[in-house]
From Swiss-Prot:
Its EC number is 3.5.99.6. GO terms for molecular function: glucosamine-6-phosphate deaminase activity; identical protein binding. The keyword Hydrolase applies. Allosterically activated by N-acetylglucosamine 6-phosphate (GlcNAc6P). Pathway: Amino-sugar metabolism; N-acetylneuraminate degradation; D-fructose 6-phosphate from N-acetylneuraminate: step 5/5. This is Glucosamine-6-phosphate deaminase. Pfam families: Glucosamine_iso. The active site is at residues 72, 141, 143, 148. It catalyses: alpha-D-glucosamine 6-phosphate + H2O = beta-D-fructose 6-phosphate + NH4(+). GO terms for biological process: carbohydrate metabolic process; glucosamine catabolic process; N-acetylglucosamine catabolic process; N-acetylneuraminate catabolic process.
Length: 270
């Protein structure tokens, strides 16, 4: 696992965006062999998306031959709802870049058969040869996508009931009314994420410090699903200083030292 420690959220976002852009450019994708990108929602990736939009508008990276698969979607929330993840992606990312609409994939939380929708999603990922780079964020309890504590580390795309903690956390997007927050979701599984050729997770803020500790120094356990990243041969966590508050001093210094030559985001595109 690589741990890239940046001073603040803006630096985290810039590094992550430049890393994604560099991976897309290096792959030299074509319509026949596109670059397949896994996309998260929430507050963590917003800065990265803004930076990627800027790189796209400057002509540094193109998304014309990129196919995306989103991590999750609420069940029962109309896709036109301002808090649906469909709306989130189009408002904050897709509508600002040169991606083809037909190349974007988001789970349908209003499908007549939710199990069939999840199976279809997994099959479509396979049809593209898997995901090249899965981006993500985590919750304070270490969950990836909507894989709450206790989720199987080999799980695939399925329907999940949200925990009370997640519902309360997400109520900030629903007028702080927990009754407006959907209680279930469709989500890729931990196994789906780990099947990607590379995984990059953004962690920022003091409230994620305990989760980062479990991700880097803790045991691999379903109670902290982010800990499964330790098993991935190409896992990267990009974090800010605030999120490292619970890491051992030795761990912090170790990763700062070995990644010292890779902390400038501009160098990633050279």
């Amino acid at each position: 696992m690589r741990l890239i420690i940046q001073p603040d959220y803006q630096s985290v976002s810039q590094w992550a965006a430049h890393y994604v852009a560099a991976k897309i450019k290096a792959a030299n994708p074509t319509p026949e062999k596109p670059f397949v990108l896994g996309c998260p929602t929430g507050s963590s990736p917003l800065g990265m998306y803004k930076a990627l939009i800027d790189l796209n508008k400057k002509g540094i990276v193109s998304f014309q031959n990129v196919v995306t698969f989103n991590m999750d979607e609420y069940v029962g929330l109309p896709k036109e709802h301002p808090e649906s993840y469909y709306s989130f992606m189009w408002n904050n990312f897709f509508s600002h870049i040169d991606i083809k609409p037909e190349n974007t994939n988001i789970l349908n939380g209003n499908a007549a058969d939710l199990d069939a929708e999840c199976a279809r999603y997994e099959e479509k990922i396979k049809s593209y040869g898997g995901i090249d780079l899965f981006m993500g964020g985590i919750g304070p309890d270490g969950h990836i996508a909507f894989n709450e504590p206790g989720s199987s580390l080999s799980s695939r795309t399925r329907q999940k009931t949200l925990t009370t903690d997640t519902i309360i956390a997400n109520s900030r997007f629903f007028d702080n009314d927990i009754n407006k927050v959907p209680k279930t979701s469709l989500t890729v599984g931990v196994g789906t994420v780990l099947s990607a050729r590379e995984v990059m997770i953004i962690v920022n803020g003091h409230n994620k410090a305990r989760a980062l500790y479990h991700a880097v120094e803790g045991a691999i356990t379903q109670m902290w699903t982010i800990s499964a990243l330790q098993m991935h041969e190409k896992g990267i966590i990009v974090c800010d200083d605030a999120a490292t508050a619970e890491l051992k001093v030795g761990t912090y210094r170790y990763f700062k030292d070995i990644e010292a030559d890779h902390l400038d985001p501009q160098s990633l595109l050279k």
